[in-house]
From Swiss-Prot:
GO biological process: regulation of DNA-templated transcription
Region (Disordered): 82-111, 134-304, 422-472, 523-646
Annotated GO MF terms: sequence-specific DNA binding; zinc ion binding
InterPro entries per the UniProt record, alphabetical: GATA_TF, Znf_GATA, Znf_NHR/GATA
Sorted UniProt keywords: Coiled coil, Metal-binding, Zinc, Zinc-finger
Coiled-coil intervals, chain numbering: 150-174
Protein name (database record): GATA zinc finger domain-containing protein 16
Amino acid sequence: MNSYQIQNQPYQQIQNTHPSFQQVQPMQVPHLQQQQQHQTMIAQQQHTPPQQHTPPQMNMIQQHTQPMLSQPQISLQMQPPSPILASQQQQQHMQSSPILASSNLTNSNNASQTTLPIITSKLLLKKEPIDQEVVNSTHKTTTTNNKPPKQSKRKEKERLEEEKQTVAQQQQYQPPFIPLASNESNSDNPFKGSHAYGVSTTPYGNSQFNNNNNNNNNNNNNNNNSNNNSNNNNGNNNINNNNNNSNNNNNNNSNNNNNNSNNNNGNNNNNNNNNNNNNNNNHNTNNNNSNSNNNNNNGYQQDKKDDYSMMIWSEVGRKINILIRTTSKATKGTPISTQEIAEAIGASNGVTADLVELIKSINDPTYVRKLPPSSISNTPTMGSQSGGMVYNSSPMLSPSTMSPILQHGNYQMGGDMYFGGNNQFSGDKQSALNNVKNSKGGNTNNSGGGSSSGGTNDTQAKKPARRRKMRYGGTELSCHTCGVTNTPEWRRGPNGAKTLCNACGLAWAKSVKSEKQKELLANSTGVNITEPKKAQKRKKESSDNNNNNNNSSDSNKVLKSDDGSNNTNLTNDDDNGYPSSPNSSNSTSPSSHNINNNNNNNNNNNNNNNNNNNNNNNNNNNNIGNNNNNNINNNNTTNSITTPTTTPFPTTIPAMQIVSQLPVMVPQTQQQPHMSGNIISFQALHQNSGYQHYK
């Protein structure tokens, strides 16, 4: 028996028991049939049923207004079908229109015998059963008029059946929800017994539902993990409250947070293994244990830090006591040794450094002074300091930047002394003397350096530089221009090879080169080309120097060159820094020697100008950070200015000039030897026909 027959049972009982169903007499009225056919034709033209828009209450009105017409209509329509089929049709219509059914049942006792057949006739006009046999043409036309409501009811039936099927499928495939209850059988294995997760007598027909269940469980477990995280964070906050005075505690708290995150990851993995409750509990206990351990560590570090700060304060107090003892002696008038003064200086520096280190340790808990051991700890009065603790850690107080007094106070206190690479002091006196000697390394023994004999540095006297006294054939060589017999190198001149000294040969070669360049330019272009500015400047300076030298040719005058050095018959440097010796017995004439000096001065002026130009170019390229170079350039330019002065002998030569150019001290009573003849400039010689040799 299907659901359709079950729904029709109550109405069939009413139909069988009610007397009106049994008293219906079939009747045939021809004019009513024609009227019905006419209505069906009109309905077919409009494609709508004739009584589609009429409400159910109109049927009740028709029962009272047309009782005589409805009865033959019923007799016509009730002939072909059987009583059971009519009851089924009436039941379907009763389901679709509940107002008619209720009115029919309530008014069944008072209604006439034609009321219920009228309802059945209306039902027959609206719906035709699928299995009904068509008897005549009139019945066929009436059934074709009611196709649209038939389709709507079919759709409604199909929708209801589909809903029933889906509900049945859900009931069939949905597994029963097994709650994660406690272990009732007290079994340690969660995958055995009736409490095992996922074990059911109903076979799983769809794996999608299983995945959904697992996802739900994982979400629940994730919520548990979030609760565990909040608990662990509370524990960390408690640790922070207990250790607000240090930064080490903050670092340890960050470590605790990392541990908590790792534990949460472990909980997620355990969710996949379906061991959620036990694992969460275990991890919570582990987190609590780790937090307690961190609390203990923080307390240990706090105690250690307190000990460290107390140790620094004790050192500060001890050093202050040293200062108080020294100052009290000084106020009383008792004599104070240099050792005590040095200890006081070291103590004051140590107090400053200790306070700086204390501030650093308070602000940064991870700060540790990793410095070499100080020499202060090796002193007799400060030997109680802990090993490895350095109290001279400030860069302002480092041995390389301290003054010699502070260095003496820190390092000359007896015992072994430690020095860096930049220190000028050492433990024993011999090494200190060697350092002092090395610091005065101006008199190095280079290949062409100056020599000294006698003077203040006799202990540091070095053997003189080697001079070439070359003999060309059997005679001794001398410069044809200046008459010098000692020169580093003999050069070619206008008279042939090895006729000029080094300085004169270079000057002559330079002049010849410039003349050749001028000739080449004049011959190539045919136009008088002006010289470059540098060449003009050099020429002007050389002419000025020559004029000044000619004007100051008296025997009681001293020529002062443009580089600031007195042009006496002392040892004068040439271009390469090699001094010439005019006082030697092999010198031919002082006048020619003075000419050589003038030439050397001119060359020096030119070199100074070149250097100044180079420095200016560098300063233009590097505008930032070259202020020192500017100062040096200014000094060079002032030195390169020609200042011809005449000073009578005896004269006092400045010590700095002597030290910078001469390694020996010159006595003040030394007089310049008389010069015979006039001083002839190099330019005048060049204007004449070649170089001449003056005796």
